[in-house]
Amino acid sequence: MGTTLAEKVWADHLVRKGSDGAPDLLYIDLMLMHEVTSPQAFEGLRLAGRKPRHVDQLIATEDHNTPTVDIDRPNPDKTSALQLTTLEKNCKEFGVRLHPLGDADQGIVHAFAPILGLTQPGMTIVCGDSHTSTHGAFGALAFGIGTSEVEHVMATQTLSLKPFKTMAINVEGKLPADATAKDIILAIIAKIGTGGGQGYVIEYRGEAIRNLTMDERMTVCNMSIEAGARAGMIAPDETTFEYLKGRPHAPEGELWDQAVAYWKTLKTDDDAVFDKVVDIDASTLGPYVTWGTNPGQGLPITASVPEPDKIADATKRAAAERAITYMGLKPGMPIKDIAVDTVFIGSCTNGRIDDLRQAAAIMKGHHKAENIHRVLVVPASSRVRLQAEKEGLDKVFEDFGAEWRNAGCSMCLGMNPDKLVPNERSISTSNRNFEGRQGKGSRTHLASPSVAAATAIRGTISSPADL
């Protein structure tokens, strides 16, 4: 019997096979780090008198707590400032490469690494961050870990893990012109639920997936965790190789040829058997938006807010009632009737150059609606920012009435100055719409950059077709 992509990468990194139910010992190629989940790990290393086993395989950046304006001024939030200075001190003490705020390569941890060519097919990649699954778009086995595991990887460059189950999600057919990668993953999560992928590595397959750019593939893999999965992967192909070629950390010359030869072997065998298979017809998809307080509460933009009294399952009915109350909605109201206060375009889900181009193409020649308080456009990395400015996208955003910011996690989460106030409603290209995710009492609707841009123009949740 053949093996899946995930099983092949696992086998290539197996240091020791566990016996009698014990976990395997897996070698880790690359660990990415940021200011939030690393302090205790560094302290543990310090107290044990250890040094990193392979410091050249550890790379850090500042992203979660960083301001996206006035980055040359002192951080007014003392806790955030402490976390940032602590990371800088720890990296200096232990010799870990750091891309700090203001550095040309600084950015969200899951955005700067692919751009630099650090993320490559067949690698094992970890980070103390759940959205590490983003890197699976390259055919890497990438997943988030806890702080104690961060320390373990620094000390040993390995992790003890039991093999994950495997799931295939086949997205066959052609994606309609008004549908995007974000709509694919929101539709998947709406179908299988936020726990549907629990314990699995999801491999995204099919014509619609193969036709995506690398930026779009990263969007899909990024939200694997919102489906409950440990990781998401897409088999590398010519699109992957073209993206990587010539990047700072990509192999060169003969090493490039050798790497590509290996990368081409990283695909699921025809006779491999997945533990679970889900099929999606891409031709039926369109713009999706979340209405509730978890990423699985999503619907086509043409739908209406669910009516709880029509939901048979008592648990789901109660969840819908709570979400509708928190979000300040009415059962049965059309999604397109929902007025929005703030628009956020950015995050490790949708802050890449393809995303910014998508939004700019829709915003060009328009101005934000009067009821929209603010539109924040935040590139996922400093390199994305520079590329966008080279293309004149920043001018498009500013003419539209949007704020063009520096790179960072920004309004994806309430850990930096970019927050919503209680009851403020946003449409956001980020990945989570939990209660209070964007600030205490915040109300978040997840959507693609194109839907976010159209919403900013009309003031109510809209698709480009509504313009």
Swiss-Prot record:
Its UniProt pathway annotation is: Amino-acid biosynthesis; L-leucine biosynthesis; L-leucine from 3-methyl-2-oxobutanoate: step 2/4
Q: Has UniProt tagged this entry with the keyword Iron-sulfur?
A: yes
Keywords from the UniProt entry:
4Fe-4S, Amino-acid biosynthesis, Branched-chain amino acid biosynthesis, Iron, Iron-sulfur, Leucine biosynthesis, Lyase, Metal-binding
- Assembly behavior: Heterodimer of LeuC and LeuD.
Q: Which residues bind [4Fe-4S] cluster?
A: C348, C409, C412
PROSITE patterns associated with the record:
ACONITASE_1, ACONITASE_2
Q: List, alphabetically, the InterPro entries matched.
A: 3-IsopropMal_deHydase_lsu, Acnase/IPM_dHydase_lsu_aba_1/3, Acoase/IPM_deHydtase_lsu_aba, Aconitase_4Fe-4S_BS, Aconitase_4Fe-4S_dom, IPM_dehydratase_rel_enz, IPMI_cat
Cited Pfam families? Aconitase (PF00330)
Q: Could you tell me what the cofactor note in this record states?
A: Binds 1 [4Fe-4S] cluster per subunit.
So which cofactors does this thing need?
Answer: [4Fe-4S] cluster
Q: What does this protein do?
A: Catalyzes the isomerization between 2-isopropylmalate and 3-isopropylmalate, via the formation of 2-isopropylmaleate.
List, in alphabetical order, the GO biological process terms annotated in this UniProt record.
L-leucine biosynthetic process
Q: Name one GO molecular function term.
A: metal ion binding
Ranges where the record places region Disordered: 423-449
Question: Which EC numbers does the record give?
Answer: 4.2.1.33
Q: What is this protein called?
A: 3-isopropylmalate dehydratase large subunit
* Protein family: Belongs to the aconitase/IPM isomerase family. LeuC type 1 subfamily.
User: Which catalytic reaction applies to this protein?
Assistant: (2R,3S)-3-isopropylmalate = (2S)-2-isopropylmalate
